[in-house]
Amino acid sequence: MKKLIVFALSLTFLFLTCCGEIPVTETTTQEETTEPEIETTTEAWEIDRTGEEIYQAHPDLTPVDYTSPMILPLSEDMGQEYVDKLTFICDSPTYWMWPWGLLGGGEDTNSIWTGPEGTMTLAYQSSYCILDPFDNIEKPIRQVVEEHKPEYLILAVGINGVSFMDEEEFKADYEDLVSDILEISPETKLMCQSIYPITPAYRWWGDITNVMITEANSWILDVAEEYGVPYLDTFSVLLAEDGHAKRELMGSDGLHPNYEGLKTVLQYIRTHKYREVTKAVG
């Protein structure tokens, strides 16, 4: 009897379905999809601690804060092609890259921006005119930046302010220059470079010492952290174990790196390539 009832119900259901009384729900089989694997790579950044042992041996020097995320780490050698893209706003220790033909264009380079006498002073940066190498006309720094908007710009100034500027004055002028460059040319990849060490052969040794320079370099790093600008520790690459500049890399005046010294600086820069860094919070 039960089988007959089930059979009758089945016939009824079939009849109603064929007549359209009961809707038929169409089912589809969803194909299983898998998300494509995204290859992620984490680049290991190795901080170059070149001068660490020297700072430990000379506690009077202000050591580099190697924990700072602004310090550019070791990278692959970017080669002369990278160097040829660099522009420097600089004072006299870096100026000599120009006459020695170390940058793009050789002795005809347009990559050294400084005063007509081959130097400039940080304290006067707001009003000082540098020589625009593209037309040999003296112009305010900011005007030259606005007109040419370089791809890479390295700020290599400060030695001419170390002897008479305190921390507040030094930072104020350095910040003013950095913030204006970032505003005028936001696509420019700006880097801050440390002041080079000197030797006691410098005739004004005492008015300027490496103790003072390392302190000023810590101020530069502070500004770099505030504005999220990468920092090049070019001081340490020229530093000898005695806490002064390596004499074989310096000119006889004790202030300016010689040809090999500036080649050493550029080798450091091209093996510590620009990368974006995270601005300090607070």
Where are these regions (language model features)?
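Catalytic His-Asp segment of secreted/periplasmic serine-dependent ester chemistry enzymes
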Residues: 197-282
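A structural signal for isolated positions on well-ordered beta-strands in alpha/beta enzyme cores
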Residues: 87, 154, 189-191, 230
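Sec-exported extracytoplasmic/periplasmic mature domains
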Residues: 98, 146-149, 158, 175, ...
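Active-site segments of SGNH/GDSL-like serine hydrolases
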Residues: 156, 160, 182-214
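N-terminal secretory targeting modules
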Residues: 2-89, 93-99, 276-282
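Conserved SGNH/GDSL esterase-like catalytic core that processes O-acyl groups on lipids
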Residues: 76-172
